[in-house]
Design a protein with these regions (language model features):
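Nucleotide-activated sugar donor-binding and catalytic core shared by glycosyltransferases
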Residues: 1-412
Length: 412
């Protein structure tokens, strides 16, 4: 009889709420794959704490956005980087997993690699090296052994850019398809009158400020073109007051709903959507809701477009490799253009049918081949990296990289 596997100690460092959500699912999947003989150290939030992590400090200490807030708290953040890396080095874990928040987690990884050069380091969630500062991919070779990608085209990008081995483990939204997709009754509501149109102007106050007027004007024009429809606006408690204030000037104020369950319920009934660029466009696409994406930034941020190397800012378009979803940016994010793009999606013409077919292709590209969850694939990749380091070679206990169709992004 072979000896049972020895206990593992894994360091996990997440820098914000989204990383905390990925982290707790990874911890759970590692225990399911390995059993209870596994201990965790590092930094996380409430979800990871519920799975047994005693965070070195509150995740709120490092979850800072924006240039000015970061500069104000820079000395404290640098201190947390040092504290985190020193604690990991002292603990001598079997592996380090860093999750998103590269400005923090990658600095921790570099310090740990210098002190423990043989420690396997896994980066869960790729930085957007395919869009911004591509030289980061090659630089990561010095301190990352494996990248776990959420988007199916990212392994190809790392191969092209000369970065670490990158594998597609699946996007966490794949685990939520039952919540996103309609049951038979909801599917019938999608096809009934009046149609449900969902509008999502963003989750930040700056987005609300820049988009609400244009979205409201577009919806007024849409009503003139197609007649009555039911308008639903999902939002979050921290921006509810701003959203309600801005929507009060619309000709017909929307039905405003709060929280994720209500948002997904609206998606399941929606005929079409108008949404700010972001993860929500991928949620809508996986829910099978034809949409128009839009965004506006300030003058300073607009200049950064010359440094960004992607043909689209919408995740579904990048995954598909084609401009299947209309996007209206900056000056194009105007009521007339938004209404003109949205109206055909509420009807049943060729524009809607083409996008519905594209969303089906997106679903096929993102699907994992064996039915296991993204968290299970991520756990297998982490364990494979540890086993491979011990054996002096890579062990392929994860999903093999898959390439998207070879085609340029077409406008249309």
């Amino acid at each position: 009889m072979s000896d049972p596997p020895r206990a593992l100690k894994i360091a996990i460092v997440a820098g914000e709420h989204s990383g905390d959500q990925l982290g707790f699912k990874l911890m759970r999947a590692l225990r399911e794959a390995r059993g209870t003989d596994i201990a965790f150290i590092g930094v996380g939030g409430e979800a990871m704490a519920d799975e047994g992590l005693r965070s070195l400090f509150p995740i709120a200490d490092i979850a800072v956005m924006g240039v000015v807030p970061v500069l104000k708290r820079l000395p404290a953040i640098l201190g947390r980087i040092r504290e985190t890396s020193e604690a990991i080095v002292a603990a001598r874990p079997d592996a380090l997993v860093i999750i998103d928040s590269p400005d923090f987690t990658h600095r921790v990884a570099r310090r740990v690699r210098k002190a423990l050069p043989g420690l396997p380091i896994v980066d869960y969630v790729s930085p957007s090296v395919w869009a911004w500062r591509p030289g980061r991919a090659r630089a990561m070779l010095a301190y990352v052994d494996r990248v776990l990608a959420l988007l199916p085209f990212e392994p190809e990008a790392y191969l092209r850019l000369g970065g670490p081995l990158c594998v597609y483990v699946g996007h966490p939204l794949i685990e939520r398809l039952d919540e996103l997709r309609p049951n038979p009754e909801e599917a019938r509501r999608r096809e009934s009158e009046p149609p449900v149109v969902v509008v999502l102007p963003g989750s930040r106050r700056s987005e609300i400020h820049r988009l609400m007027a244009a979205f409201g004007g577009a919806l007024d024009l849409l009503r003139d073109r197609i007649g009555a429809f039911e308008l639903v606006l999902p939002t979050l408690p921290h921006i509810e007051a701003e959203v309600r204030g801005a929507a009060a000037s619309w000709r017909e104020p929307p039905h405003i709903v709060l929280g994720e369950p209500e948002r997904y319920a609206a998606f399941r009934r929606a005929r079409a959507a108008l949404a700010a660029s972001g993860t929500v466009t991928l949620e809508l696409a996986l829910a099978g809701v034809p949409l128009v994406g839009a965004y506006k930034v300030g003058l300073v941020e607009e200049q950064l477009k010359y440094l960004i190397k992607v043909p689209s800012i919408l995740l579904p378009n990048l995954i598909l490799g084609e401009a299947a979803i209309p996007e209206k940016l900056q000056r194009q994010c105007a009521p007339e253009e938004l209404a003109a793009a949205l109206a055909p999606l509420v009807g049943d013409g060729p524009e809607r049918q083409a996008q519905v077919k594209a969303l089906a292709r997106l679903d096929a590209l993102m699907r994992l081949p064996d039915g296991r969850s993204p968290s299970a694939h991520a756990a297998a990749a982490v364990l494979g990296t540890i086993a491979g380091r011990r054996a002096g070679r890579d062990l392929d206990l994860f999903v093999a990289p898959r390439k998207r169709p070879e085609k340029r992004l077409k406008q249309g």
